[in-house]
């Protein structure tokens, strides 16, 4: 019996979600398609009914994960007082929880160096996600002069991604926690200086 278009779309969505988690946890090159499909509750043989290649799956998983991340961060600060929004965003992203759970975190922090070596379309999707995160941060930089918000927000997102990436190198080390704390403090102090 053939699946309906709705069922096929739901299955594809499950594969993309499983792939995003698998890539973030194990790296793109280490994530076998058989493991991705098993994580989605499917057999390896069904992969090519949904995707032309692993590259196509990487592109879609990166896009979907970044869109979900930005949406969840927007929801996190929705209806919060302006002065609490930026610290809340920074604390949430640059955290032990994010460091310790790469499967559910930002693909830029989990896969940055691998994404840099992917095809042009995938790099474009990754940069669009970076820019969306930057725009979200910029929207909460009311103490920074308007003309400097874009560049400041890009620097902040770069620091956030870098901190989580570095903290994951030695997650059981006191240095790991220090990197997270120092980066959070530095970002918030640097923004407050521009009042």
Go through each PLM region and give its residues.
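Short, basic, alpha-helical segments at the C-terminal edge of helix-turn-helix-like DNA-binding modules
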Residues: 63-68
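N-terminal intrinsically disordered/low-complexity leader segments
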Residues: 1-10, 193-195
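Active-site oxyanion/phosphate-handling segment shared across diverse enzymes
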Residues: 130-140
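Solvent-exposed, amphipathic alpha-helical segments
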Residues: 14, 18-25, 72-75, 159-166
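Amphipathic alpha-helical segments used for helix-helix packing
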Residues: 84-88, 100-127
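Hydrophobic/aromatic-rich alpha-helical bundle segments in the mid-to-C-terminal region
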Residues: 119-128, 141-195
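Hydrophobic alpha-helical connector segments
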Residues: 60, 74-105, 153-156
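Helix-turn-helix
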Residues: 14, 22-56, 60
């Amino acid at each position: 019996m053939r699946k309906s278009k709705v069922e096929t779309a739901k299955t594809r969505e499950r594969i993309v979600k499983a792939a995003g988690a698998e890539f973030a946890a194990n790296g793109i090159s280490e994530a076998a398609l058989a493991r991705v499909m098993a994580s989605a509750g499917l057999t390896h043989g069904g992969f090519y009914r949904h995707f032309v290649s692993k590259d196509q799956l990487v592109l879609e998983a990166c896009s979907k994960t970044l869109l979900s991340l930005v949406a969840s961060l927007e929801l996190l600060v929705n209806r919060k007082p302006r002065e609490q929004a930026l610290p809340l965003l920074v604390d949430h992203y640059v955290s032990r929880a994010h460091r310790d759970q790469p499967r559910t975190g930002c693909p830029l922090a989990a896969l940055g160096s691998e994404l840099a070596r992917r095809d042009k379309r995938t790099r474009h999707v990754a940069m669009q996600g970076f820019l969306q995160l930057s725009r979200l941060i910029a929207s909460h930089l009311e103490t920074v002069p308007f003309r400097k918000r874009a560049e400041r927000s890009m620097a902040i997102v770069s620091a956030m991604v870098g901190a989580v990436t570095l903290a994951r190198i030695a997650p059981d080390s006191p240095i790991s926690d220090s990197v997270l704390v120092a980066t959070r403090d530095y970002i918030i102090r640097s923004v407050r200086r521009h009042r």
